Amino acid sequence: MSFLGGSECAANANPLAQFFKQSQHDTSLEQSLRNSAHDTHQNAQIRAPVAMNEAERAHMEQFMNQSTPFNFQPMANELRMIQPDLQTQTTPALRGPRAQNPVPLQIPGQAQPQVSGWSSEFQNTATSQVTHSPSPVSQVRMRSMGMAPRLHLRPFSSANGPIQASSMTNSVMQEDTSQQVDWEQQFKEMEEMEEMEEATAAMQQPAEETVSAQESAFDQVWDNIQETYADNMLSNDEFQAQWEKDFEKYAQTRLNYGEYTFEENNQFRNNLDAYEIGIKLMESGAKLSEAALAFEAAVEQNPGHVDAWLRLGQVQTQNEKELAGIAALEKCLELSPQNLVALMTLAISYINEGYDNAAFATLERWIETKYPEVAERARNANPDIQADDRFSLNKRVTQLFIKAAQLSPEGANMDSEVQTGLGVLFYSMEEYSKTLDCFQAAIEHNPNDALAWNRLGASLANSNKPEQAIEAYSRTLQLNPNFVRARYNLGVSFINMGMYRDAVDHLLTGLSMHEVESLDGSSSVARSNQSTSLIETLKRAFLAMDRRDLIDKVKPGLNVESFRKTYDI
């Protein structure tokens, strides 16, 4: 016989062999357990016989010739008395047709044995009452049918075939033994859990002590901070001194530009009306480079001329000569520390050069000068003015400008310079949507301000809106055609859009505005305070156009008119 492929003659599939096995089995144990049992009618059911050989037929005749048939009913009664009746505990799904006709578990590759009639009948009354522990295979099937896996079910072993009646009492005794082992195992697990809880409690106690110690240390440090803070309270005069020290600190974090460098060949040097000439040149729309020479002559004649230094700084920043403009504006503030126009212009120049902290400190000085009550309330509300990181300083100054803007929120009384300062603060933190709102508000208040239109164009360009930026720059040049910085910004926008020919045209025009006429009528370019940004950007445009032959031709002192004629640009 083979457990892997049982045939018709195998004991697992032969009903007569199973009958004979039951009749010859020792039933002394069952007899001792059923002294009070009565014989009842046996309701054995046998299915149609299969073909038998001679040996099987002889076994059958021997069995049939016995005086009385083997009675299984008393044994079944005794089993019902020994084992708990699980019939009432069976779920309705288990009492259905599938429960009445259970199918033994079949392992793949192994033939499923045929089930005899008596075995089927016995399984109707006994096998459904025996608890088993499910295998992983049976658990998967239960879940797939929507049934929760039963606990303590032990699956059949397909190699042993259907459960035999003679093995039931042995299984009862084995189950009692297994229950005893289970109880011992459970007691052991409970003891282990108690030991783990004790160990955990022992570990938590030092941790709680550590937390308590840390809280005490924190309280002590906090008390020390409060005492130190109370001892270091500053008066208003001390606040003012600290504020000035703060400004000087941030102003010194940038590059030291030193003294302003004057142009050697200046046609206005000996003109006593150089300052007035410079004003007229700006009003008439002359080149900014010519006006710069006039203001240079004015401050050389009178180094204490505040307005001349201010005008010189404004002209040089608009002429795309940022460093020269910063030097002039700082000199102006040395002479007049509370000059509002110089403070705002210098703060914007600091932002352009990347000195953000110096710009924030300059804007803070601007608020303190124009809106002292706002600064005073801020000092009283927030005595800690020691924060020197970029973000904290920007936040502090931004709050000051917002409070100043709330004093005149709208209408003719709105301070456009407050909106400009707010826009610069937001611009430095790359918050371009807020920047646009501020500069647009400033333009609404003064629609003909070329500087405001140029700032709006820069914000639009950094917001990835080059078309709108070009419109803003174009409006700037309509208001001030000699605004070199606006032409430079316009050229950069054209490069970003791939319109290199237009970019080159505006950049060359900006360079041509640096040329001035000398006393003999010839054109020349200032040798001092030259702009490198225009030259470097023009080289980028030629590189993008694949005109490498022109890159080396672009250098300081370039004669733009001759360059255009020679290279047809």
Swiss-Prot record:
A motif (WxxxF/Y motif 2) lies at residues 183-187. There is a cross-link at K21 (Glycyl lysine isopeptide (Lys-Gly) (interchain with G-Cter in ubiquitin)). Its main location: cytoplasm. Keywords: Cytoplasm, Isopeptide bond, Peroxisome, Protein transport, Repeat, Thioester bond, TPR repeat, Translocation, Transport, Ubl conjugation. Pfam families: TPR_1, TPR_16. It is found in: Cytoplasm, Cytosol; Peroxisome matrix. GO terms for biological process: protein import into peroxisome matrix, docking. PROSITE patterns: TPR, TPR_REGION. Monoubiquitinated at Cys-9 by PEX2 during PEX5 passage through the retrotranslocation channel: monoubiquitination acts as a signal for PEX5 extraction and is required for proper export from peroxisomes and recycling. When PEX5 recycling is compromised, polyubiquitinated at Lys-21 by PEX10 during its passage through the retrotranslocation channel, leading to its degradation. SUPFAM superfamilies: TPR-like. One of its GO terms (cellular component) is cytosol. Gene3D superfamilies: Tetratricopeptide repeat domain. The keyword Ubl conjugation applies. A motif (WxxxF/Y motif 1) lies at residues 118-122. Disulfide bonds: none annotated. A motif (WxxxF/Y motif 3) lies at residues 243-247. Residues 218-234 are annotated as: Amphipathic helix 4 (AH4). Residues 57-72 are annotated as: Amphipathic helix 2 (AH2). InterPro entries: PEX5/PEX5L, TPR-like_helical_dom_sf, TPR_rpt. TPR repeats lie at residues 272-305, 306-339, 340-377, 378-415, 416-449, 450-483, 484-517. Interacts (via WxxxF/Y and LVxEF motifs) with PEX14; promoting translocation through the PEX13-PEX14 docking complex. The TPR repeats mediate interaction with proteins containing a C-terminal PTS1-type tripeptide peroxisomal targeting signal (SKL-type). The WxxxF/Y motifs mediate interaction with PEX14, promoting association with the PEX13-PEX14 docking complex. Receptor that mediates peroxisomal import of proteins containing a C-terminal PTS1-type tripeptide peroxisomal targeting signal (SKL-type). Binds to cargo proteins containing a PTS1 peroxisomal targeting signal in the cytosol, and translocates them into the peroxisome matrix by passing through the PEX13-PEX14 docking complex along with cargo proteins. PEX5 receptor is then retrotranslocated into the cytosol, leading to release of bound cargo in the peroxisome matrix, and reset for a subsequent peroxisome import cycle. Belongs to the peroxisomal targeting signal receptor family. This is Peroxisomal targeting signal receptor. It comes from Pichia angusta. The gene is PEX5.
